[in-house]
Amino acid sequence: MEHHLKIDNLGPIKHCSLDVSNYMVLTGYQASGKSTIAKVIYYFRSVKDELVAVMMKQFQSQDYSTPLEDALRRHLMEKLYRTFGVAAVSVPGMKISYSYTKDIWIHISVGEKRKNCRFSPQLKDFLHSLDNEYRTGDVHAKLSEVNGLIEYLAKKTKEFNLLFNDSYETIYIPAGRSILTLLSSQWNYLYSTMDDAQKSLFDECTRDYIENVLLLKSLYSRDYERKSLDTLTDAHLRDLSKKADTLRNFILKGRYVCENGTEKIELSNSSKVDLNFASSGQQEVVWVLNFLYIRLITHRPSYFIIEEPESNLFPASQKYVTELISLVVNAGHASLVTTHSPYVLGAMNNLLYASTLPTDKLKEADSILSKECWISPDCFSSYFVEDGVVSDCIDHEIKQIDSSKMDAISSIVNDEYDRLSMLMWDDKGRNV
C-alpha cells in the first residue's frame, strides 16, 4: 500500500488528497501550495525520527513521567508550529492526515477551541507496548551500558521502518539554496552561536537542511566521497556511480571539493573557484548533487524532497539533473520533486516514454537515453496544483504527463506573437 495524504485548509491548500508514490512531481503556479504539500509529506515521513528523538530525550533526562504517546503527540504539535508557523495551523477547519498503512495513521485537526492530534488504535497500542518495554528493569539496564542505547535505538529504528511502512531516510532540499550555499563558510560559526529562539526563526525544513549540509560538508572535508567509492564492491552500483558522476559533471561543470573547510568547485582544467564566487546555478544545485551522489554510493535508501531542482540552470542542465534524480530513484531510492520547468517535465516525459517502448526497440532507446534513467509509469505520479486544489496531470492513456500542463504558456506566447505579426499586414495582405 502507498502512503496517502490529505490536507484541508492549510496555507494556500484548500483540499488535497493523493497517494504518495515512489516518484512524484508537483507542478503549478508559484504560491499555489506545492511547497506546503512537500512540507506536510516531510513532516509525516519524519515522525519515526521524532519518535527516536523523544525516546532519546526521556532516557537522557531519566524522566519517564510522561507516557510515550503523550510525549510524541506534544513533540509533533511543537514541530507543526515550527514547520508551518502558528498562524497557518491555527485556522479552524485545518486538517492534515497521513496513512502509512490501513492500520497506521495520524490525523491532526483544528477546531474552534482546540487542536487535536490523533493516532490510530494500532499505533497507540504499539506506543504503549514500547513504553512498557523500555521502562522495564532489564531493558533499562542494557540502555545504561556503553553503546547500549545506540544499539537499542538502531534495533528500534528497523521496527519503526516496518511499522510506518517506510525504509527511507527523508531529506528535504528547499528552494532558495544559493543564499545558504553562499553563506556556508560562515554557517558553522553562525549556527553554533544561535540559541534555540534564534534557530526557531528558520522553518523546520530549512533548519534540517542546514544541519544536513553542515554534516555532509564535514564528511567531504575528510575525503568521504573517495573513501566511499574505494570501498564500493557492488559492480552494478559502481557502474551507476560512474554514470551519475558523468551527469553530475555535465550539470556542475566541475567537481565539489572541501579543503581545510573551504568549499571549491574544481573545474575541468584543474583550476578551482571558491564556491561563494561560483555561478548562481552552481550554488543552487551543488548540494542537490552532493546529497544524491553520496546517498547513491553509500546505498542509504533515501526519500529526497527536492524543490525546484532547475533553479538558475540552463535547459540542458535541467534535463541532466532530471536524469540524475531518476537514476538515483531507480537505484533504490525515492523522490518528490516540485518544479515550474517545462524542461524538467519534458525530460520526465521522455524517460517515461522510453520505458514503454516495444521490447525490440529498447536497445535502440537505451542508446538515446540511458535505461538506468527511465521512469516506470507504475511508480510515478504527477499533480498540478492550482487555486488551492490538486489534480492528477497524468494522461493515463499514453502514461505521460499531460502536455497541456507544459504547453499552456507556450500557446499563449505563440498566440500573442501571431497577433503581433498580423499587425505587419494590411487588410489586403500587404506588408505595412
Label every PLM stretch briefly.
Residues 1-205, 346, 352-373, 391-392, ...:
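P-loop NTPase switch/coupling surface
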Residues 11, 24, 279, 310-314:
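Catalytic acidic motif of RecA-like/P-loop NTPases
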Residues 41-44, 270-306, 315-320:
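GG-anchored amphipathic helix commonly corresponding to the ABC/SMC/Rad50 NBD signature/C-loop
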Residues 231-254:
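Amphipathic alpha-helical domain-onset/packing element
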Residues 301-303, 332-336:
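Loop/turn-to-beta-strand initiation segments
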Residues 318-330:
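Helical segment within the ABC ATPase nucleotide-binding domain
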Residues 338-340:
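H-loop/switch region of ABC-family ATPase nucleotide-binding domains
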Residues 364-401:
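C-terminal structured domain segments
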